[in-house]
């Protein structure tokens, strides 16, 4: 494949846009560099770049596009609303209707507020938890990404009793001192952190199913024990479901797993491809948010009519019968096909799949912890990524990211992807 126009546009982009991209994950730095492909349009499961190349897309904008690009029902809803106005600065009936559908699907969302991104949603749940508990510190799990606000860009200390350190320039050490990071799926480390810090801990921030170092399930009993230990300590449980809400079934991962948090942050999928974030939870906690309570959160674009209309249309597609069964079937076909090819070519790799999402790790052990992904073979992934890209398969340019299937992928798309993987693996020997 030729990428002449992408390379030209990337050089031009570097003149005007810092680093040539508006989010660092879009660069190819993690796969050895080079100009990222510049896309022109998307339809269904496919993307088309400025050089005219066609791709089967498993990036899906890092997760939001579960119904594929330019889904007719969602596109029609957006166009119709745009003709009526995109922003009023007043309450709308659309906000009410969307909130109602979300609470019907996720019962723990007793009260809901909308924001504009997952970062805002998580940031605000932490503020609300602090207001409710009158405590300051939070616990999070290593490897989970919760947005780019200061409080969650904190690296782990040397153990559960140790405070974190800034994971980005510009994050004050004083902020990092409010965060304790422990390993996911390690309940004893979590218990040790709670026992040490006790009433300092306002909340624990959890991805109930991890989506930020690939797709990783909680070990049996882990989430239940986190809930018990937390509540015994007066600590709130916040679920970051920005990736997982409506990913695996019509609802949130918490309902699939049978574990209920106190607060939930959501985003990505529920916006139907438009910017969105939201949070909600127990009414007695949510009532601490302005205008009813002292915890302030506001936003000019929050609950804007365009995103609300797109979100409603998105849920109307996902609530149809058989949607998630199809995603699971396609995911299984892709997983089983990749595994056969791994065995055929004697590739050191393992697969984690959860319904219609999966991650291919270049390591010889089943992945349950962040350190395993960190230590996996990044060079092998980079080689695989480029070999797949050159055959028209678009993956996330990072060994930490997942592959996402959509309602628009077909068995033929899976088979074509497996043909590409067969070739890629043959070149990696």
UniProtKB/Swiss-Prot annotation:
Assigned keywords, A-Z: Cytoplasm, Isomerase, Porphyrin biosynthesis, Pyridoxal phosphate
Enzyme class per UniProt: isomerase
PROSITE patterns the UniProt entry points to: AA_TRANSFER_CLASS_3 (PS00600)
Main location: cytoplasm
GO biological process terms, semicolon-separated: protoporphyrinogen IX biosynthetic process
EC number: 5.4.3.8
Cofactor(s) required, per the database record: pyridoxal 5'-phosphate
Subcellular location field: Cytoplasm
Pathway the protein acts in: Porphyrin-containing compound metabolism; protoporphyrin-IX biosynthesis; 5-aminolevulinate from L-glutamyl-tRNA(Glu): step 2/2
Any one GO cellular component localisation term in the record: cytoplasm
Record SUPFAM superfamilies: PLP-dependent transferases
Single GO molecular function: glutamate-1-semialdehyde 2,1-aminomutase activity
Catalytic activity: (S)-4-amino-5-oxopentanoate = 5-aminolevulinate
Residue(s) carrying N6-(pyridoxal phosphate)lysine: 268
UniProt family annotation: Belongs to the class-III pyridoxal-phosphate-dependent aminotransferase family. HemL subfamily.
Assembly mode: Homodimer.
NCBIfam families: hemL, PRK00062.1, PRK12389.1
Protein name: Glutamate-1-semialdehyde 2,1-aminomutase 2
Taxon lineage: Bacteria, Bacillati, Bacillota, Bacilli, Bacillales
Gene: hemL2
